[in-house]
């Protein structure tokens, strides 16, 4: 090879190595943003810039692959997550101690004016933009929910039309040009920097310059030197100083977030590229004055990576999604039906649910309809999204459901004598550790043994025993304590070595270690079977399981088992007979409960009370048994259930679980890996909690 050609090739190779193989194509919406983005690209070759006319155009470009990312507010996170775009948030802005990854939506008026929030009819309003969180979704949703704006719904007229008759005039960038919603605007009324009154500072300037009477912005918008001239409008019709935003606000909402395709590799590229930026301030727009909040909000202190699998719904939270739906008057799936949509996990539960649905029909109408999902977590997501209404879950799953805004509606009762008393003793059970008799296994020598668990995140099978073990060891790596085990989970990873292939041919090997009935060692009976068949040395289950699966009871695999061949172990005691669970247990824990959305609670209770009069333990219709399982164990409800009892209205998930259980969970959650992806997504923002 000639030396000149070789040098040329080496030069090309060096250039190729110096430039990232894939650049992050950032979408911008104005000339000023393009300037800042170009400066970023010059400072960091990991970026390139794509200019579009609006946020929606950027979302469409990302969907089409023309761009990779853009930072948007909550309203646009919602839009980006719709099926026709299918983008999801991967990184959130963090605003520091004043609000972390949330901010407050506030209504601001000039000091000296006297109107309150209930006196806004006929006033002139300034908004950050149509469909944006602080400037539109939250204030208009709040005014509608408080019946200040009286809107019958989209069947009557669009909400924009109702708002235009409520306010004397407005500037709502993104509204129809020439309408009253654009009357106060200074430029083209677009949702871009071409409109001087666009975004937070634009809406504030609309108020400051006297165009409007009220501005809907975020709590950090009013400059420090101007705060004494303005006041906040509170929901109780009073006013407060600007710095009292924590007590006087319309809502606390999730921070702006970066959205992109559902591509983990691209998400990681965006994250690492942003973190590698040097000699460039991502969160400052001073060099591009008077423009502000270019690419990122100027108040951003840092960026925070979101939990994996966070979608727009989980990021925004149920409360915010409810506000957006109220503005769109969205109908959830199946709302024309009065049936409760029950969520079943796996094939066996779905088959039982279908039978229940058929038997629930009266006057050609089913009281129960069935939805299904591959795991409890996926069912909980469906309930949150109104694709399903209810399901019965164990205490650990009540904890996760509660963190995601769901509430307990009814609880399983295992004592028939207590079924006839209303408001009687709450149902509970004992979490126990079971070993084979004469195995020599005790609580004190448990380390290094093989373990059988009902499932990751379950109460008796995981949360209680592993919480106890963490209290002893202060080590979050539980594989050091139990090097081998079976602990079924939605996404099998650790603790799967002892799990077995699925019994049901329909599921194949894919069900191995999955948290659903097709995994033979899943659930209470499954964990006991893991011990009985010699796979494990200890099973963490509830106190009734041995009796339900020995001495001729239970399914075929259990028929030859004897209860006397098993013992309980607990801290500070040698092995004791199974019958001594009251004195040798790991904890007394609340029974399984039916969870649902707060607004659906009364309907779920009403339907289930009727259903158990027909199909309960002493029901009038023998054609179907709600608390029996023919092709498995504990399908939909625990087989030991005698009745369902109402959980008092207003009971939160932590009140239901009790202080002891919550303390155990607080201890266990010191190990961050013990929280599921769903729980992490639901608790990422403090503002997601109502």
Curated annotation (Swiss-Prot):
The keyword Repeat applies. Transmembrane segments: none annotated. Residues 1-17 form the signal peptide. Residues 24-329, 340-670 form the Transferrin-like domain. The keyword Metal-binding applies. GO terms for molecular function: metal ion binding. Hydrogencarbonate 1 binds at residues 128, 132, 134-135. InterPro entries: Transferrin, Transferrin-like_dom, Transferrin_Fe_BS. Monomer. This is Serotransferrin. It comes from Oryzias latipes.
């Amino acid at each position: 090879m000639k030396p000149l050609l070789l040098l040329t090739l080496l030069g090309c190779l060096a250039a190729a190595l110096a430039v990232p193989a894939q650049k992050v194509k950032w979408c911008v919406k104005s000339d000023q943003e393009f300037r800042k983005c170009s400066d970023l690209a010059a400072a960091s070759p990991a970026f390139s810039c794509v200019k579009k006319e609006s946020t929606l155009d950027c979302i469409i470009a990302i969907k089409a692959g023309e761009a990779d990312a853009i930072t948007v507010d909550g309203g646009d996170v919602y839009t980006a997550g719709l099926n026709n775009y299918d983008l999801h948030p991967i990184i959130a802005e963090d605003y520091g101690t004043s609000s972390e990854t949330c901010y407050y939506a506030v209504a601001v008026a000039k000091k000296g004016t006297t109107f309150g929030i209930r006196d806004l009819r006929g006033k002139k309003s300034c908004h950050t933009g149509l469909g944006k969180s602080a400037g539109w979704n939250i204030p208009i949703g709040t005014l509608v929910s408080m019946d200040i704006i009286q809107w019958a719904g989209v069947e009557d007229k669009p909400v924009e039309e109702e708002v235009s008759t409520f306010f004397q005039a407005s500037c709502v960038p993104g509204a129809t040009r020439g309408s009253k919603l654009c009357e106060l605007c200074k430029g083209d009324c677009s949702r871009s920097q071409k409109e001087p009154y666009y975004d937070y500072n634009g809406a504030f300037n609309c108020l400051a310059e006297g165009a409007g009477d009220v501005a809907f912005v975020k709590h950090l918008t009013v400059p420090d030197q101007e705060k004494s001239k303005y006041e906040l409008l509170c929901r109780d019709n009073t006013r407060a100083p600007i710095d009292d935003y924590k007590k006087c606000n319309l809502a606390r909402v999730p921070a702006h977030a970066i959205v992109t395709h559902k591509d983990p590799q691209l998400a990681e590229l965006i994250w690492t590229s942003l973190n590698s930026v040097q000699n460039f301030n991502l969160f400052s727009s001073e060099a591009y004055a008077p423009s502000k909040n270019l690419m990122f909000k100027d108040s951003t202190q840092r960026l925070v990576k979101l939990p994996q699998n966070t979608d727009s719904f989980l990021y925004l939270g149920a409360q915010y999604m409810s506000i957006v739906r109220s503005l769109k008057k969205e109908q959830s799936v199946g709302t024309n039906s009065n049936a409760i949509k029950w969520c079943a996990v796996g094939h066996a539960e779905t088959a039982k649910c279908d039978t229940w649905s058929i038997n629930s029909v009266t006057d050609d109408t089913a009281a129960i309809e069935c939805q299904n999902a591959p795991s409890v977590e996926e069912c909980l997501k469906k309930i949150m999204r109104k694709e399903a209404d209810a399901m019965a879950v164990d205490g650990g799953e009540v904890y996760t459901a509660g963190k995601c805004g769901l509430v307990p509606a009814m609880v399983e009762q295992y004592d028939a004598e207590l079924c006839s008393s209303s408001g009687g003793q709450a149902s509970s059970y004992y979490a126990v550790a079971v070993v084979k008799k004469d195995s020599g296994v005790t609580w004190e020598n448990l380390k290094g043994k093989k373990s059988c668990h009902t499932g990751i995140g379950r109460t008796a099978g995981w949360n209680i025993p592993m919480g106890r073990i963490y209290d002893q060891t202060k080590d979050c790596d539980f594989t050091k304590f139990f090097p081998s085990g079976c602990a079924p989970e939605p996404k099998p990873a650790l603790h799967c070595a002892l799990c077995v292939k699925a019994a049901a041919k329909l599921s194949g090997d894919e069900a191995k270690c999955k948290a659903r009935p097709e995994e033979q060692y899943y659930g209470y009976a499954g964990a006991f079977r893991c011990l009985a068949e010699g796979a494990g040395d200890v099973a963490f289950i509830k106190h009734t399981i041995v009796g339900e699966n020995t001495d001729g009871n239970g399914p075929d695999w259990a028929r030859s088992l004897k209860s006397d061949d098993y013992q309980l172990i607990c801290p500070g005691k040698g092995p004791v007979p199974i019958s001594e669970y009251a004195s040798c247990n790991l904890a007394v824990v609340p029974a399984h409960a039916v969870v649902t959305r707060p607004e659906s609670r009364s309907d779920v209770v009403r339907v289930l009370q009727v259903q158990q009069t027909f199909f309960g333990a002493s029901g009038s219709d023998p054609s179907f048994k709600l608390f029996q399982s023919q092709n498995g164990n504990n399908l939909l409800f625990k087989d030991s259930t005698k009745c369902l009892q109402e959980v008092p209205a207003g009971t939160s998930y932590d009140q239901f679980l009790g202080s002891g259980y919550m303390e155990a969970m607080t201890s266990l959650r010191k190990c961050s890996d013990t929280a599921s992806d769903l729980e992490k997504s639901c608790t990422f923002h403090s503002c997601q909690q109502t």
